[in-house]
Amino acid sequence: KVVTLTDTEKTIKTELTVIQTNVEKMLSISLTEADKDRLVVKAGENIDMPVSLNVGYDCVASESWIKVLATPPFEGDIVQDIMIKIAIDPNTGDEERNGYIVVKNSGDVTDVSDTLFISQRACNQIVYVKAGASGDGTSWERAFGTVEEGLAACTDYGSMELWIAEGEYHLKSWTYLKKGVNTYGGFNGTENKLKDRDMTKKSTLVAAPANTWPSIYGNVLSAGVHCYVDGFVFTGSNVTQGEGSVAFWGGWILRNCMIRNNKSYRDAGGAFFNVTLINCLICNNTTADNGSAKATSSIVNAQEGTRLYNVTIVNNESSGSSSGLRINRGAVYNSVIWGNVHKIGTNHQGYLDVNKSTLFVNNAIQGGLVYNGGNTPSSTEGCIILNASNAAADGPGFMDAGSGDYQLQSTSPLIDAGSNPAVQSAWDIIGNKRIWGEKIDIGAFEYITKE
């Protein structure tokens, strides 16, 4: 640009040429912060991503299902508005998935960048439940008020999910979960993405007082189907019939759940048949004679290839065959079994059925690995034996076992004692990041260093 300069009398004139150059690199996605956290439907969709910049750039997607289709060239050194074309593939998986696109200046050193986050649904419809509500379940604002209403609105294998807000729900009878419908709890009642939950919150399902059967059933799923139950507390069962406080068969995955304060004549901590448990806490349950039903089995009955990852089984009481875990043909990784009382004999923390192979890898257990009538696990790699005293140097080192706080103290031997290849989740039961140290911790809770 040319600027003309003169004296006050305008007798002298000269011209000044001003050349403007970019002093500071600039690059940003031209969307609000809320719109930079994008929700995409299960079927996939195309996205136009507007970007303002004054530098050459690179555009990189974090996941293979996010496709960068077109990146217009940057021309010149003035601010330029471009439109980057993005395509999201259909989600054929079991759960919501998350990824991102980073736009940054070209080169190895990043001076300026911006990110578009993408969450993609795994279903076509969500049914909402919130304690005290009275709607039709189509949104949080119009949520159903009871779990029974929410389940009635779902259909088996119907490309649906059931989202239940935090709070306490008193069940009316035994409850069958819908097959192929992921059921999530712990929402505050405003989220539109699964990742936005505060995992310290849970939805509590209280068994009906008159129900003498397991309070929750998950029946066998179709071959190849997996179904998640995540973010719940199951409590209040008083069982004299059936398998245990909760009962699940083939294909179900229980994650970030607590099973506590239940009484049953068998399997008060749950009965699981070809099921996966991840980041679960099972505590303060009692297997004992209940009315005319005589005590049998254990606290947790894991059969037919059930797998446990980072499960904490503590402070339960049994008059059955063992006080902690009864398992066959399964696998137990990064789990702790401690403080479980056997009322009728030796304090058996676990039991292996005859002639069944079971993997025990990087677990911590009190009083010996298993009572098994002469059988042995096919592997006990990395397992440690715990003292019966929580406060001992070789005790579990829970924060306050007496009051039910099973998070870890900084001196706990469970810290960094797990097996990293067995990690099944990037988060623990209350949303803390895994892995925090060099290795994953044993149990449902990851120890986090306080800054």
Task: Identify the role of each PLM range.
Residues K1-E9, I84, E95-G107:
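A short beta-strand micro-motif common to beta-rich folds, especially ectodomain repeats
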Residues I12-N22, V112-N124:
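C-terminal edge beta-strand
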Residues A131-A165, D441:
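Acidic Gly/Asp/Thr-rich repetitive segments characteristic of extracellular carbohydrate-active
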